[in-house]
C-alpha cells in the first residue's frame, strides 16, 4: 500500500521492511527509518538494476541469490532480433503509457521490442501533454516525474506500432479495449497480457522475461 500506517508497522517489530520509492509515500518510509526500523528501498528502472536488487535482497535475507533470472537475462541479451514496434498503455481516460526511463521499457527492449513512446516524456500541465498548449520548462518542471505521458490515440496512430500489449494492471484492459485498438490500428497485432510480466521486478523476473519474449515473438501469434 502507498500509505503505510507507521505505528502499526512499528508495533509488529519487523526484522526488515521492503519498500519501493515509487509505490510508497516518502514521509512514511522516512518515519520508519527514523524509528530504527530496517528498511530496504528499491526503485529499479532497468533489468540489470532489478537483478542487482534481487542480489541485495538475497544478501539481506541470508539466502543464496536465485540464478534463474540472471540466466534468463543472459540468454535473451545475446539474441539478435529485428525489434518490433510496441505500444503498451497503462491507463485509459486519459490514455497513458511510459517512456524509456520506465522499467517496463527496458524489459521490452531485452526481448526484442521497441517502445514507440520511448522518446515521449510526460509534459506539464495536462493540456501540454495532450498537445493543447506549450509545455512548462526549466525550474517549473524540475523534479517532476516525466516517465508516464498522457497521450491521445492519434499519437498512437502516428507512431505506427505493429504490436500492442494490453496489460491487466494497473488498468484492467479487456476484450473491449482490444477491439477499440484493433480497429484503430488494423495493421497491428493486439494482445491481452499479464501486467505482472511487464511491471513486477521481483523473484518472478525470469518467468516474466520468457513470457514477454513469447508475446513479442511473431511466430507465437495466436491462431
Please identify what each model-predicted range represents.
Residues 1-48, 67-206, 222-223:
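Binding-cleft/active-site segments that stabilize strongly anionic ligands or cofactors
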Residues 54-62:
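Helix-loop "lid/cap" segments that line or gate small-molecule binding pockets
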Residues 61, 216-220:
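Short, hydrophobic alpha-helical segments
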Amino acid at each position: 500500500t502507498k500509505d503505510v500506517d507507521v505505528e502499526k508497522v512499528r508495533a509488529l517489530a519487523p526484522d526488515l521492511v521492503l519498500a519501493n520509492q515509487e509505490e510508497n509515500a516518502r514521509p512514511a518510509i522516512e518515519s520508519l527509518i527514523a524509528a530504527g526500523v530496517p528498511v530496504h528501498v528499491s526503485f529499479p528502472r532497468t533489468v540489470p538494476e532489478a537483478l542487482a536488487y534481487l542480489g541485495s535482497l538475497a544478501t539481506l535475507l541470508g539466502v543464496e541469490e536465485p540464478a534463474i533470472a540472471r540466466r534468463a537475462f543472459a540468454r535473451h541479451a545475446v539474441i539478435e532480433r529485428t525489434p518490433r514496434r510496441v505500444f503498451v498503455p497503462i491507463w485509459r481516460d486519459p490514455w497513458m503509457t511510459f517512456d524509456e526511463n520506465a522499467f517496463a521499457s527496458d524489459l521490452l527492449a531485452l526481448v526484442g521490442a521497441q517502445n514507440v513512446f520511448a522518446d515521449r516524456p510526460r509534459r506539464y500541465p495536462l493540456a501540454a501533454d495532450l498537445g493543447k498548449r506549450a509545455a512548462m520548462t526549466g525550474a517549473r518542471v524540475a523534479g517532476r516525474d516525466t516517465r508516464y505521458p498522457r497521450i491521445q490515440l492519434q499519437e498512437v496512430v502516428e507512431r505506427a506500432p505493429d504490436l500492442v500489449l494490453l496489460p491487466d494492471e494497473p488498468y484492467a484492459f479487456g476484450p473491449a479495449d482490444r477491439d477499440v485498438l484493433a480497429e484503430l490500428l488494423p495493421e497491428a497485432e493486439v494482445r491481452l497480457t499479464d501486467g505482472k510480466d511487464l511491471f513486477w521486478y521481483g523473484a518472478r523476473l525470469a518467468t516474466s522475461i520468457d513470457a514477454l519474449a513469447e508475446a513479442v515473438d511473431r511466430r507465437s501469434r495466436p491462431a
